[in-house]
Amino acid sequence: MMITSAVVLYLLLLSHQTVSEEQVQQFVIGEKGNNTTLHCLDHPVNASSVLYQWKKDGAVVATQNPPNPSVHLSISENGFLRISGLQLIDEGLYECESQAKGGRSWQTLSKIQLTIAAGPTGVSLDISPATFLNNGTLFVHKGSNVNFSCSSESNPSQNLTWTVDNLASDNPEREFGSKSPLAFSITNIQPLDQGTYTCTSQNTLSRRTANKTQELLVYYAPERHPECSWELGDKPSDVLFICSWFGGYPVPTLTWQEVEGAAEGPTINLTTSQQTEELNVSVNRSILHDGDKVKCTGHHVTGVEKSCSFTLKIPYPTGQPLATALEGTNITISCTETSSLPPAKTVWKKNDDLIENTSKYIVQENRPALTLTIVNVTKADEGVYYCYSENPLGARELEVYLNVKTSAGNGGAIVGIFVSVLVMMIGIVVGVTVYTKRDRICIGLRFSQLDDDRVDVLSLVDSDEEEIFHEAVPRLPPVTNGHATTLVEIHRIPSCDHEDIADSTEQSDQTRANLTEAGPQRAELQPAV
């Protein structure tokens, strides 16, 4: 506002300086295309006694009672100048002159400065890059760089202002200036920047304004993929397929369709499309088959397309088919089901009766496992238990046979354990005994080998030559019966020498004879030669 006032004041001063010498008495502002009337200020009281004419910039432009009246310029009876349909060329200094009837001179009565204000017209704005919708609204993609430009025509000058009307901005003014076009830009535009953008142009002289508005939307697709899920329908025979894709603007278009059907049986014939963030489709379970593949595709106006899918699978519970328990104890059996789509409901049964939590049975679900604990097992608990899994495609079960053993049946096991321990202890004793007697056992084996490999001859020889014993001969300790110990020398004879066996035999006889004698003797085992 301050800038506008300053411009108007400047123009007025400029006009005043231009015609100051002419003593301008009035300044009039007219708008292009409108009508205006210039008053002759000092006209006589009896206007009918005088004639009037008007000059513009020193040239006569209008007289009373002209031979060819002008629609654009005309003079009233009281001397007022009426200008119809103001044009820019009408701008200038106007002088009102009067002359008495029959007189010959004209007298200037007033001088008026007429200024023509035009516009603003032709206000236009441009927002790019942007796309028009059918209703004329523009949209841009989130994260893009957007340029804004506004222009208009105005005389003598104008002020341009960009404003935005949205909930996120406290200050609606975005840009201001007097030069046309007026431009600014937004880098990495976000959803908070969407709103109604207005370009306003104001004539600095006439204060007339003109504007143009444009609604701008910021579109963006969801960042994540669609999510496919399922649940049982309102009817036991129905299953509900759920596709959701949240987080985009505007809402996407979701489509359910069958991608791959089963080899046999009727197809799902699932093709449903809707502009929404969540699309639910109810399908009768009778047309669902193991191996059917369904897909949900999300289309967004920004051009983004994403999808999710799943393949239908019948349940297949797994686990150990045999369990053994001791009577009077607790036992836990379990089964696991992970392959079914939609997820199956799994329960434990016995004899087609559903097993629920009681003081006897404890059922616990810890997905994907389902456990059954039988408390204080008895012989009556023996039998087949069923892990039953069912989903909309069908049902399957796992048979688990429970074998219950009584305490009397453990006697054989106890005896077996006792015998095993006894055999182990005997083995340990034998091993320790052999280890402690290893020297005797080894020596006995050694002598038995010597008897097999060679023939030894024992010879006892009496000797009177005491000098052959130069060193003290060690004595063996005396035996308890008091007899003297005989010293024996053993000389080995290889078993392969058999020539003098007869002589050796004679010596052996002699040796046996000598051993019968009492007293210290010397035995010598000499090899036969």
Swiss-Prot record:
<keyword id="KW-0732">Signal</keyword>
<dbReference type="InterPro" id="IPR013783">
    <property type="entry name" value="Ig-like_fold"/>
</dbReference>
<feature type="glycosylation site" description="N-linked (GlcNAc...) asparagine">
    <location>
        <position position="159"/>
    </location>
</feature>
<feature type="glycosylation site" description="N-linked (GlcNAc...) asparagine">
    <location>
        <position position="376"/>
    </location>
</feature>
<feature type="glycosylation site" description="N-linked (GlcNAc...) asparagine">
    <location>
        <position position="330"/>
    </location>
</feature>
<dbReference type="InterPro" id="IPR036179">
    <property type="entry name" value="Ig-like_dom_sf"/>
</dbReference>
<feature type="disulfide bond">
    <location>
        <begin position="150"/>
        <end position="199"/>
    </location>
</feature>
<feature type="glycosylation site" description="N-linked (GlcNAc...) asparagine">
    <location>
        <position position="211"/>
    </location>
</feature>
<dbReference type="Pfam" id="PF07679">
    <property type="entry name" value="I-set"/>
</dbReference>
<feature type="glycosylation site" description="N-linked (GlcNAc...) asparagine">
    <location>
        <position position="34"/>
    </location>
</feature>
<feature type="glycosylation site" description="N-linked (GlcNAc...) asparagine">
    <location>
        <position position="280"/>
    </location>
</feature>
<keyword id="KW-1133">Transmembrane helix</keyword>
<keyword id="KW-0812">Transmembrane</keyword>
<dbReference type="GO" id="GO:0016020">
    <property type="term" value="C:membrane"/>
</dbReference>
<feature type="domain" description="Ig-like C2-type 2">
    <location>
        <begin position="129"/>
        <end position="217"/>
    </location>
</feature>
<keyword id="KW-0393">Immunoglobulin domain</keyword>
<keyword id="KW-0325">Glycoprotein</keyword>
<feature type="glycosylation site" description="N-linked (GlcNAc...) asparagine">
    <location>
        <position position="46"/>
    </location>
</feature>
<feature type="signal peptide">
    <location>
        <begin position="1"/>
        <end position="18"/>
    </location>
</feature>
<protein>
    <recommendedName>
        <fullName>V-set and immunoglobulin domain-containing protein 10</fullName>
    </recommendedName>
</protein>
<feature type="disulfide bond">
    <location>
        <begin position="335"/>
        <end position="387"/>
    </location>
</feature>
<feature type="glycosylation site" description="N-linked (GlcNAc...) asparagine">
    <location>
        <position position="35"/>
    </location>
</feature>
<feature type="glycosylation site" description="N-linked (GlcNAc...) asparagine">
    <location>
        <position position="135"/>
    </location>
</feature>
<dbReference type="InterPro" id="IPR003598">
    <property type="entry name" value="Ig_sub2"/>
</dbReference>
<keyword id="KW-0472">Membrane</keyword>
<dbReference type="InterPro" id="IPR003599">
    <property type="entry name" value="Ig_sub"/>
</dbReference>
<feature type="glycosylation site" description="N-linked (GlcNAc...) asparagine">
    <location>
        <position position="269"/>
    </location>
</feature>
<feature type="glycosylation site" description="N-linked (GlcNAc...) asparagine">
    <location>
        <position position="357"/>
    </location>
</feature>
<dbReference type="InterPro" id="IPR051275">
    <property type="entry name" value="Cell_adhesion_signaling"/>
</dbReference>
<feature type="disulfide bond">
    <location>
        <begin position="40"/>
        <end position="96"/>
    </location>
</feature>
<feature type="transmembrane region" description="Helical">
    <location>
        <begin position="412"/>
        <end position="432"/>
    </location>
</feature>
<keyword id="KW-0677">Repeat</keyword>
<dbReference type="InterPro" id="IPR007110">
    <property type="entry name" value="Ig-like_dom"/>
</dbReference>
<feature type="topological domain" description="Extracellular">
    <location>
        <begin position="21"/>
        <end position="411"/>
    </location>
</feature>
<dbReference type="InterPro" id="IPR013098">
    <property type="entry name" value="Ig_I-set"/>
</dbReference>
<feature type="glycosylation site" description="N-linked (GlcNAc...) asparagine">
    <location>
        <position position="284"/>
    </location>
</feature>
<feature type="domain" description="Ig-like C2-type 3">
    <location>
        <begin position="317"/>
        <end position="403"/>
    </location>
</feature>
<feature type="topological domain" description="Cytoplasmic">
    <location>
        <begin position="433"/>
        <end position="529"/>
    </location>
</feature>
<keyword id="KW-1015">Disulfide bond</keyword>
<dbReference type="Pfam" id="PF13927">
    <property type="entry name" value="Ig_3"/>
</dbReference>
<dbReference type="GO" id="GO:0043005">
    <property type="term" value="C:neuron projection"/>
</dbReference>
<feature type="glycosylation site" description="N-linked (GlcNAc...) asparagine">
    <location>
        <position position="147"/>
    </location>
</feature>
